């Protein structure tokens, strides 16, 4: 058992207790960040005269050697160590001797792990941001190619009004754009360095916390040492933001699953992103979309676990907080995997454009435009609404669409109808005359696409 404490104990730790308490099985995930933080700490200690330049150089060389050996698989992180901190320190002392014993001067594992987690989360946020950016670029491409691909828009899963595929994809563009914004907000709010806070009450050593923060690219040092070691707000915020990302992916997947059915046939998922059945040879299943939808609950669960863990903890650090890592790591890996797979599936998906437009025509999605036509002829909207309701009922009885009615049939229900009704309710006209901000008309969508292009070129981090 390699651990960083034990002087005041008269007995060896029970093996079951040691195993239960140890975190090396999961906190080894941020070995790189642990070494990065230690390097900055050592440079600061030397700058403040707490370490000599010779000691600093020796420790830095030893830390770099550990990092290189781990990354090149020459050194294995094993369960004989309690945590990643003890692994690094024990190996450092073994390599460079007594100088390595000075690494932890002016530092506690409480502020050390708080730093490691923040460094790790910063890296992961940047990675997730890159994955969201690729998804947004994929959506932008689909939008640009489908300004005139008409389809039904839905409310209550029933056909409502005609829109375009570009407009539908644009709704998801907005969702994932907001997701990027949330990640950026979390990054900005958490970007303060906790190192130097000690166990909870700072330290008597003359540490330069601002210098350490600068070395590690933080905005500044944290302002309260107790909060620094017990703050997990940024993890709760991240898990909430990731839950929202997964909710958006899940909604999108649900639509793809529906659109992929024989009853809709709006899309065909590429073979590379589909699976079959062990008994039914005809099956081509949307398993990726279903798994993304299913994994959403897993990320929600991590958020609820984190909230529950933190809800009753008095200041400052408590061992309960060790539970933050496994669930956060798992949620991050889940979200990144889902984003990458979903983007691949979406970019290879084939949209059945003719089927989409035919579905819009057969679902009375132009009924609102028929009512608007009557309003334009001077009929009060409430009366127009009732007239078109009778038109729809007539079409249902005859099993025809509004476009299929003769002018004589129209005029039997209302003499206000003229030959121009057919142009008024054409799919193209229904969509293209809607050009206010946020509407599906091509002119409105071109403005959106241009703004999207500028947005996609911006640097977030």
Say what each PLM segment does.
Residues 38, 66, 128, 132-135, ...:
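Amphipathic alpha-helices that form helix-helix packing interfaces
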Residues 2-37, 98-99, 280-461:
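Glycine-rich cofactor/substrate-binding loops
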Residues 41-51, 164-167, 236-244, 369-378:
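Short, well-ordered beta-strand elements within core beta-sheets of diverse protein domains
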Residues 216-308:
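Acidic, glycine-rich loop-and-beta core segments that form the ion-binding/anion-interacting portion
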Residues 1-202, 207-214, 220, 275-276, ...:
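A helix-coil-helix interface module used to build multimeric assemblies
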Residues 145, 182-185, 189, 218-222, ...:
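Conserved helix-loop functional segments at active or binding sites
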Residues 127, 131, 157, 161-171, ...:
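Short, contiguous, pocket-lining structural segments
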């Amino acid at each position: 058992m390699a651990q960083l404490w034990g002087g005041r104990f008269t007995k060896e730790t029970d093996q079951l207790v040691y195993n239960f308490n140890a975190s090396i099985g999961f906190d080894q995930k941020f070995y790189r960040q642990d070494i990065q933080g230690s390097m900055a700490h050592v440079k600061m200690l030397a700058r403040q005269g707490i370490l000599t330049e010779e000691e600093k150089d020796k420790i830095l060389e030893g830390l770099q050697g550990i990092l290189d050996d781990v990354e090149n698989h020459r050194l294995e992180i094993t369960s004989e160590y309690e945590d990643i901190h003890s692994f690094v320190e024990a190996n450092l002392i073994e390599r460079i001797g007594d100088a390595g014993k000075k690494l932890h001067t002016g530092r506690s594992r409480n502020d050390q792990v708080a730093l490691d987690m923040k460094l790790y989360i910063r890296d992961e946020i940047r990675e997730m941001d890159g994955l969201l950016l690729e998804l947004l670029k994929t959506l932008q491409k689909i939008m640009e190619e489908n300004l005139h691909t008409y389809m039904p828009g839905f409310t209550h899963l029933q056909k409502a009004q005609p829109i375009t595929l570009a407009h539908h994809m644009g709704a998801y563009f907005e969702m994932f754009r907001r997701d990027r914004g949330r990640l950026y907000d979390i990054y900005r709010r958490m970007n303060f360095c906790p190192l130097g806070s000690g166990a909870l009450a700072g330290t008597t050593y003359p540490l330069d916390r601002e210098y350490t923060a600068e070395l590690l690219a933080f905005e500044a040092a944290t302002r309260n040492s107790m909060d620094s070691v017990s703050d997990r707000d940024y993890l709760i915020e991240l898990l909430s933001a990731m839950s929202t990302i997964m909710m958006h992916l899940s909604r999108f997947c649900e639509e793809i699953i529906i659109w992929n059915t024989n009853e809709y046939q709006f899309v065909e998922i590429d073979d590379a992103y589909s699976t079959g059945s062990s008994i039914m040879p005809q099956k081509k299943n949307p398993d990726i979309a279903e798994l993304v939808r299913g994994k959403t609950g897993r990320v929600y669960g991590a958020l609820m676990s984190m909230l529950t863990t933190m809800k009753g903890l008095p200041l400052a650090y408590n061992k309960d907080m060790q539970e933050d890592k496994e669930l956060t790591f798992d949620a991050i890996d889940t979200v990144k995997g889902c984003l990458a797979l979903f983007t691949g599936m979406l970019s290879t998906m084939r949209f059945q454009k003719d089927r989409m437009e035919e579905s819009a025509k057969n679902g009375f999605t132009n009924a609102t435009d028929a009512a608007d036509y009557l309003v334009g002829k001077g009929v009060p909207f409430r009366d127009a609404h009732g007239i078109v309701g009778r038109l729809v009922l007539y079409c249902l009885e005859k099993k025809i669409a509004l476009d299929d009615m003769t002018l004589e049939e129209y005029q039997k229900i209302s003499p206000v109808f003229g030959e121009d009704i057919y142009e008024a309710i054409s799919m193209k006209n229904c969509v293209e005359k809607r050009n206010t901000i946020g509407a599906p008309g091509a002119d409105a969508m071109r403005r959106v696409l241009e703004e999207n292009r500028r947005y996609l070129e911006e640097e977030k981090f």
